[in-house]
């Protein structure tokens, strides 16, 4: 009988100076076979595409059951993923996140909208617009679809 070890051989990690990826915990473990770039990992990675936010059922149900308000888009930045709506009743501007906008167009200043309101956690003292629908596009203003096509002049 031979006395061979039953553990697999130790293989050093692969290194590729051209690899743009620097995996971080939990993906990069000592002895793992990942390609890594020498030096410091990048810190300013672009955020992923915006998607619908996950809210608790109770928060979603409360917002959906609430009244519909009207307002006008004051400002919206697609690159930052948020903007503000001026309520029709003249109260304080309401925050709107890109994930809460329904429909195919990116809002621009002057677009008329309808929306419902949801408290902003953790203190729930301020509100944000949810279920935002563009009801009237601002006249004589080009609009962009979420896919990037420009419509109007």
Swiss-Prot record:
The keyword Calcium does not apply. The modification Phosphoserine is found at residue 19. Disulfide bonds: none annotated. Keywords: Cytoplasm, mRNA processing, Nucleus, Phosphoprotein, RNA-binding. SUPFAM superfamilies: Nucleic acid-binding proteins. GO terms for molecular function: mRNA 3'-UTR binding; RNA binding. PANTHER family: CALCIUM-REGULATED HEAT STABLE PROTEIN CRHSP-24-RELATED, COLD SHOCK DOMAIN-CONTAINING PROTEIN C2. This is Cold shock domain-containing protein C2. It comes from Homo sapiens.
């Amino acid at each position: 009988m031979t006395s061979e070890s039953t553990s697999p051989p130790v293989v050093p990690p692969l290194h590729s100076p051209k690899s743009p990826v620097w995996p971080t915990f939990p993906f990069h473990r000592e002895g793992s076979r990942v390609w890594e770039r020498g030096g410091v990992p990048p810190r300013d990675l672009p955020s992923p595409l915006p998607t619908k936010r996950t809210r608790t059922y109770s928060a979603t149900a409360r917002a959906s059951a609430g009244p519909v308000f009207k307002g006008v888009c004051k400002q919206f930045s697609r690159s930052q993923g948020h903007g503000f709506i001026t309520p029709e009743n003249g109260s304080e501007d309401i925050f709107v996140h890109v994930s809460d906008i329904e429909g195919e167009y990116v809002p621009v200043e002057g677009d008329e909208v309808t929306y419902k309101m949801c408290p902003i956690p953790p203190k729930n003292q301020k509100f944000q617009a949810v279920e935002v629908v563009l009801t009237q596009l601002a006249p004589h203003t080009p609009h962009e679809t979420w896919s990037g096509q420009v419509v109007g002049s």
